[in-house]
Amino acid sequence: MISELCTFALATGATRVVLRHEGGPGGRIEAPNWHSGGFLIVNASGRLFRVPLASPALEEIPTGSVSGLNNDHGPSPDGRTLAISAKSETGGSCIYLMPVEGGEPVRVTPRTPSWWHGWSPDGARLAYAAARGGGPVGVTTCAVDGSDERPLAPGFDHADGPDYAPDGAWIWFNGERDGSADLWRVRPDGTDLERMTEGETVDWFPHPSPDGRHVLFLAYPPGTRGHPADLPVALRLMPQDGGGSREVLRLRGGQGTSNVPCWAPDGGAFAFVRYPA
């Protein structure tokens, strides 16, 4: 399986292939974050890697006693801490925090399953997808110490991918309701729920840009169930204050392409992964 770790510049429309990986050590590359220190963070075969933009190569980030990471991870707003998601001692996914350079993770969420997706702009809270009490997966937040867990936006068949707007005023997510899979946003206190897309495509993983202008999201073909890999998909942009979206890239991908926040710190570019056939 070939993985191409790429960046896309909004001003020029240029795609740069940062790293072309043909399997081997690390396996399939997935879910890039763009760190302010000039490197990307990716998952490959349940391990985390740093990829310096100036001299691209996979450099493993040690995760101590925690293994089998999934592709839901991301650095804190100050760039010092990394949120990761991995199987707990009891088997369900939970969220851990660790130094961005690597180290022994500290478990945050006492309950499982929990899959991290976003930091609040002040670094005080985490947004994640969680299933509780046998119910469907939904949008949830908690304090960084795992306390004050708050489920948001009930009433969806499935809700996932929550990510904060840069001013902290909204949490964007993808939600399935009444047979439609669209993007939504809600206030951090659970009020003012608002549908932001409505169309034939199956929309996943909204990521508001740090400059407050855009939301990047992944659009699957109509009728797609879940967020599978290796399909013809599109990356689309829409304004953060609402309105129509536009396609910026068409590629082979899906799962692993843009699961987590992937914007450059200035909002002028984003990272993604594609999987050429």
Q: What is each PLM-predicted segment?
A:
Residues 1-16, 30-31, 39-49, 74, ...:
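Histidine-/acidic-rich catalytic cores in large beta-rich domains
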Residues 2-5, 47-49, 91-96, 135-140, ...:
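Structural motif
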Residues 7-28, 53-68, 98-113, 142-160, ...:
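Multi-bladed beta-propeller domains
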Residues 11-12, 36-37, 45, 53-55, ...:
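Short strand-connecting beta-turns/loops that link adjacent beta-strands
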Residues 23-41, 67-82, 111-129, 156-174, ...:
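Conserved beta-propeller blade repeats
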Residues 35-46, 83-89, 127-134, 171-178, ...:
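Beta-strand C-termini and the immediately following turn/loop, strongest in propeller blades
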Residues 83-87, 92-109, 115-116, 127:
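Hydrophobic alpha-helical segments and helix pairs
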Residues 179, 200-237:
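Loop/turn-rich, solvent-exposed surfaces of beta-rich toroidal or solenoidal domains
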